[in-house]
Amino acid sequence: METNIIQKIGQIGVPVKDLNRALDFYKEKLGLSLLFNTNSMAFFECNGLRLMLTLPEKEEFALSSSVIYFEVNNIKDTYERLLGKEVTFIDEPHVVAKMGQTETWMVFFKDTEDNTHALLSEVEA
């Protein structure tokens, strides 16, 4: 039996234009725990997954970003709380899928560096 080459996702990197502005957004608005930062990077802990904000080393890395789906318990309450912290949302919380008695809700937002991310919540219907 072949074992998996990839064991797990250990870190997600997000390119930023202004590290201090991004650091404030992820720490103060999203409430992530800052592990440490340098002049060009900041590392956060998010329930066992490390999130790295980085000033791109090369121009070709400046635009590459993935959507990060942040799981929350109550998407509507979290949405309202983050609106109060002036987080810019692209839409409102909405159902994207229903599997049996479980609904998957999402709402997309922009960080201060123009990266798109989302809140995700699975709710018993």
Predicted regions and their residues:
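Conserved active-site tyrosine of GNAT-family acetyltransferases
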Residues: 22-27, 82, 114
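Vicinal oxygen chelate
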Residues: 1-5, 85-125
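A short, glycine- and basic residue-enriched loop/turn
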Residues: 13, 40-41, 106
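N-terminal beta-strand motif that seeds the catalytic metal site of vicinal oxygen chelate
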Residues: 1-20, 66-68, 121-125
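Mid-chain, well-packed structural core segment of small domains
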Residues: 71-87, 91
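Short secondary-structure junctions
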Residues: 31-36, 89-93
